Amino acid sequence: MRESAHTNTSLWSKGMMAVTSAQFLSAFGDNALLFATLALLKAEFYPDWSQPILQMVFVGAYILFAPFVGQVADSFPKGRVMMFANSLKLLGAASICFGFNPFIGYTLVGIGAAAYSPAKYGILGELTTGDKLVKANGLMESSTIAAILLGSVAGGVLADWHVLAALGICAVVYAGAVVANLFIPTLPVARPGQSWRFTPMTSSFFNACRVLWRDGETRFSLIGTSMFWGAGVTLRFLLVLWVPTALGITDNATPTYLNAMVAVGIVVGAGAAAKLVTLETVRRCMPAGILIGVGVLFFSLQHALLPAYGLLILIGILGGFFIVPLNALLQERGKHTVGAGNAIAVQNLGENTAMLLMLGLYSLAVKAGLPVVGIGVGFGALFALAITGLWIWQRRR
């Protein structure tokens, strides 16, 4: 089924609702499956060091397939690419459920996620236009964060009840995402006729990297989003060590609740950005980025639970307000230069590389015996300074 003129600019069109529903189910499955698979590793007495390997193979798939997934998203109707990617996730979850090696199964999920990302964001620019693209990004980010919240909690609760049942429910959720993809209109291919030989494909990707990096606005967006997501993943791990040190609470639930506060804040911030920021006023988001670092600094010095909750909600609001306009800017500029799919693939490479780099630096700091509170203060200060530098550079440009 094709929509006339290829786009329906309404945020509540059938196509947008199908994309948002598929994204919610897919992200819900990703987060529920992570905690269900971690429970499986514990139940089968895998060593503790094996648990972070799950996240590593997931992120590694993004980096390994970065040169290819953007072209896939731009060479086929994006709704069908999303359906194929969710089918890979379904296969990975089902294989874990039926007793196959969980790392191999989770790698399949990671490959599916890598293929899914350029298509899910790239299709927004084909279903909406102009300033509605910012609002569409806000809707997508809000749906994603809600899925992260609910999926994480559901994965843990279901795994405590029955690990295999939790894995099976994850597979059913992915199946629901596949069905939702069927309702996305078949849109025209963005960049038909590209070569599928290895060398031209990699050359095309790295050419897209060069084109986006040489453009001041897209370089600005790439750096900003990469720093944000690298910092977000690092903060998640920082909380695990910070809670017992700063609050004297040793349970496993409290860090999860604190992470949830950040996610709630991001939903609010994403909604505010959709209403207050346009593609012409993207720089309005930069003070929020600086204040994220300041918020982390003050949060690290807290010794009571209530102000910690409040500061993390505030950090989340600032984060949502910061990331949504930068995503929209990259999609809009990328669509007219290298294709939206290639632009998002380049963005994924930057973000996941930043995640690995920041987590590596954090791990080195912990291994060196630096106090967790000091790490948090330094991390917040460095992030604020980095975003300030990015803002100054952009203003001078």
UniProtKB/Swiss-Prot annotation:
- Cell inner membrane found in the keyword field: yes
Q: What are the annotated GO cellular component locations?
A: plasma membrane
* CDD domains xrefs: MFS_MefA_like
The yes or no answer to whether the keyword Transport is present is yes
Q: Matching InterPro entries, A to Z?
A: LysoPLipid__transptr_LplT, MFS, MFS_trans_sf
Family of the protein in this entry: Belongs to the major facilitator superfamily. LplT (TC 2.A.1.42) family.
**Signal peptide location in the record?**
none
Cite the Gene3D superfamilies for this sequence: MFS general substrate transporter like domains
Q: What does this protein do?
A: Catalyzes the facilitated diffusion of 2-acyl-glycero-3-phosphoethanolamine (2-acyl-GPE) into the cell.
Q: How does it sit in the membrane?
A: Multi-pass membrane protein
Q: Which organism is it from?
A: Enterobacter sp. (strain 638)
Residues passing through the membrane, by range: 21-41, 53-73, 91-111, 139-159, 164-184, 229-249, 257-277, 281-301, 304-324, 344-364, 372-392
GO MF, one annotated term: lysophospholipid:sodium symporter activity
Q: List UniProt keywords, sorted A-Z.
A: Cell inner membrane, Cell membrane, Lipid transport, Membrane, Transmembrane, Transmembrane helix, Transport
- Output this protein's name: Lysophospholipid transporter LplT
Q: Which gene encodes it?
A: lplT
**Where does the record place it?**
Cell inner membrane
